[in-house]
C-alpha cells in the first residue's frame, strides 16, 4: 500500500520509507495495530492540518471554522450511529486522553476507582500506580481468577469493600466476553459510575460480535484504531445529557486545546467505512481467524491464558510453554519479521518490561486478507521458532516462509472496492 515518500528532509523521508518497508515485510500481530485505508490517510494528511480552532461546532473561539464544524458534526453523527449512542465527543487525541477526560468529568482528585489489574489484562489508565489514574486518584484493582476469567461475584465483593466512585470494565489483554449487564449490577450495588473502555473490541461491538456496553455503562470510550481500523485517536460516548456536558468540558478546556481537525476528518472517513457491509464481514473474519489461530496453539499444548479466545486477541504463557520470557520471545520472533508484544500474564512474577507472555492479535493481518489457513501456518511457524530459540538455521528457514506470506498478502489501499 505504502508509496515511497519524498521530502526535502531526506533524513525523515528515509526513516518513513524504512518504516513503510518494515510494515510491508513484517507479519503484524500486535493487537493494538491495524492498517488504515488510503482514504483515511488522505484525510489525515489533508489541508485540515493547517486549521486551528477551539471549542465545539457552532461555539468556536476562532473564525473560519465553517467547514471543520461540518466535518466534526458528521464525525459525531456517524459515531453515534455506529454505537447507537446519543452523544459523541470525537476530539480526544488518544485513548489515554479520553480516559483522563472521563476521570475529570466524573471524579474529583482523590476519589476511588476500581479497575482490572495490569497483569490480568487491564490498562495503565485504569488505575496503575505510575499513570495519572493511580497518581491523582485512589485506585483499587480486581483480578481474573486462576482460570484467567473474570469472577463477577468476587468483583462485587471487592466493590462493596472499597466503595469506588467509578468502576472500569474493558481491557487491553482479555480474550473473553465482558458481561456489561453484570458490571451494571455491581456499579448500582455500590452507587458507582460505570465506565466501559472498549478500545480493543469496538469493531466487534459494531458488528454485534460482542455485546455493547451502551445502555449499561454511564460512559464509553474507544480508540479509533485497533479493530475499528481508523486513524490514531479516540472518542467518548454516552446516552446521558448531563454526563455529555461534563465530558465536553473535560475534553475542552479540561484536557485539550485545539482539536486536530485532520484527525477528526480521518475518524469520520473510518466511521464511514465501518458503516459499510464489508466492515461487518471483516469483523466476522477476525473472529474466525483468531479462534483457529488460538486453537492451533492449544492443540500443541501451549498454555493460552483464559482458554479459547472469544475476540480478536489472546495471550500465551511462553514461560510455562517454552521456558522463555515474553521479552525473549518477542526478540526471537522479531528476527523472523514476526511482530508481537511481550505481555504480563495473571499473577506474573516478571516485571512488565520482561513478562511471562506474549499477546497475539489478528486484526492487522486479517486486513491483509489472511484467512484461517494462513493463521494455522503462522501458528506452526511461531511454535517451531519458540521451541528451538537458538536454532539459527531453522530461524532462517522460518524467515523465508514469513517473507512468502507477507509478499502474498500486501497491505491494501482500500477496503471497499472489490477490484
From Swiss-Prot:
Transmembrane segments: none annotated. GO terms for biological process: glycine biosynthetic process from serine; tetrahydrofolate interconversion. The gene is glyA. Its EC number is 2.1.2.1. Disulfide bonds: none annotated. The keyword Calcium does not apply. It comes from the Bacteria. Catalyzes the reversible interconversion of serine and glycine with tetrahydrofolate (THF) serving as the one-carbon carrier. This reaction serves as the major source of one-carbon groups required for the biosynthesis of purines, thymidylate, methionine, and other important biomolecules. Also exhibits THF-independent aldolase activity toward beta-hydroxyamino acids, producing glycine and aldehydes, via a retro-aldol mechanism. HAMAP family: SHMT. One of its GO terms (molecular function) is glycine hydroxymethyltransferase activity. CDD domains: SHMT (cd00378). Keywords: Amino-acid biosynthesis, Cytoplasm, One-carbon metabolism, Pyridoxal phosphate, Transferase. Belongs to the SHMT family. The modification N6-(pyridoxal phosphate)lysine is found at residue 226. One of its GO terms (cellular component) is cytosol. It is found in: Cytoplasm. The keyword Amino-acid biosynthesis applies. Homodimer. The record marks 225 as: Plays an important role in substrate specificity. It catalyses: (6R)-5,10-methylene-5,6,7,8-tetrahydrofolate + glycine + H2O = (6S)-5,6,7,8-tetrahydrofolate + L-serine. This is Serine hydroxymethyltransferase. Its cofactor is pyridoxal 5'-phosphate. Pathway: One-carbon metabolism; tetrahydrofolate interconversion; Amino-acid biosynthesis; glycine biosynthesis; glycine from L-serine: step 1/1. (6S)-5,6,7,8-tetrahydrofolate binds at residues 118, 122-124, 242.
Amino acid at each position: 500500500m505504502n508509496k515511497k515518500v519524498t521530502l526535502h528532509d531526506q533524513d525523515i523521508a528515509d526513516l518513513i520509507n524504512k518504516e513503510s518497508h518494515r510494515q510491508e515485510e513484517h507479519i503484524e500481530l500486535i493487537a493494538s495495530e491495524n492498517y488504515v485505508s488510503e482514504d483515511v490517510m488522505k484525510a489525515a494528511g489533508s489541508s485540515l492540518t493547517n486549521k486551528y480552532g477551539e471549542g465545539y461546532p457552532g461555539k468556536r473561539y476562532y473564525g473560519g471554522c465553517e467547514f471543520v464544524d461540518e466535518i466534526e458534526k458528521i464525525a459525531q453523527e456517524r459515531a453515534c450511529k455506529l454505537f447507537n449512542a446519543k452523544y459523541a465527543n470525537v476530539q480526544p487525541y488518544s485513548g489515554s486522553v479520553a480516559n483522563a477526560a472521563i476521570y475529570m468529568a466524573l471524579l474529583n482528585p482523590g476519589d476511588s476507582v476500581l479497575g482490572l489489574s495490569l497483569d490480568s489484562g487491564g490498562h495503565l489508565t485504569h488505575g496503575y500506580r505510575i499513570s495519572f489514574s493511580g497518581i491523582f486518584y485512589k485506585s483499587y484493582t480486581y483480578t481474573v481468577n486462576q482460570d484467567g476469567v473474570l469472577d463477577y461475584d468476587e468483583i462485587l465483593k471487592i466493590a462493596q469493600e472499597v466503595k469506588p466512585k467509578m468502576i472500569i470494565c474493558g481491557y487491553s489483554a482479555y480474550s473473553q466476553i465482558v458481561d456489561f449487564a453484570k458490571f451494571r449490577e455491581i456499579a448500582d450495588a455500590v452507587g458507582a459510575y460505570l465506565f466501559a473502555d472498549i478500545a480493543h473490541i469496538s469493531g466487534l461491538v459494531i458488528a454485534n460480535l460482542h455485546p455493547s456496553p451502551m445502555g449499561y455503562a454511564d460512559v464509553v470510550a474507544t480508540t479509533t484504531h485497533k479493530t475499528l481500523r481508523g486513524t490514531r485517536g479516540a472518542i467518548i460516548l454516552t446516552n446521558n445529557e448531563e454526563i455529555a456536558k461534563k465530558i465536553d468540558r473535560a475534553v475542552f478546556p479540561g484536557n485539550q486545546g485545539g482539536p486536530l481537525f485532520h484527525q477528526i476528518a480521518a475518524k469520520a472517513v473510518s466511521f464511514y467505512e465501518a458503516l459499510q457491509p464489508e466492515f461487518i464481514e471483516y469483523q466476522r473474519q477476525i473472529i474466525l481467524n483468531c479462534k483457529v489461530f488460538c486453537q492451533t496453539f492449544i492443540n500443541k499444548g501451549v498454555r493460552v491464558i483464559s482458554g479459547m479466545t472469544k475476540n480478536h486477541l489472546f495471550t500465551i504463557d511462553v514461560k510455562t510453554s517454552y521456558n522463555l520470557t515474553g521479552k525473549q520471545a518477542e526478540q526471537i520472533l522479531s528476527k523472523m519479521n514476526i511482530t508481537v508484544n511481550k505481555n504480563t500474564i495473571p499473577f506474573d512474577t516478571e516485571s512488565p518490561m520482561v513478562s511471562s507472555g506474549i499477546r497475539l492479535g489478528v486484526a492487522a493481518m486479517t486486513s491483509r486478507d489472511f484467512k484461517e489457513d494462513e493463521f494455522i501456518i503462522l501458528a506452526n511457524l511461531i511454535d517451531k521458532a519458540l521451541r528451538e530459540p537458538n536454532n539459527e538455521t531453522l530461524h532462517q528457514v522460518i524467515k523465508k516462509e514469513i517473507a512468502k506470506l507477507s509478499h502474498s498478502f500486501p497491505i491494501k489501499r482500500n477496503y471497499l472496492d472489490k477490484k
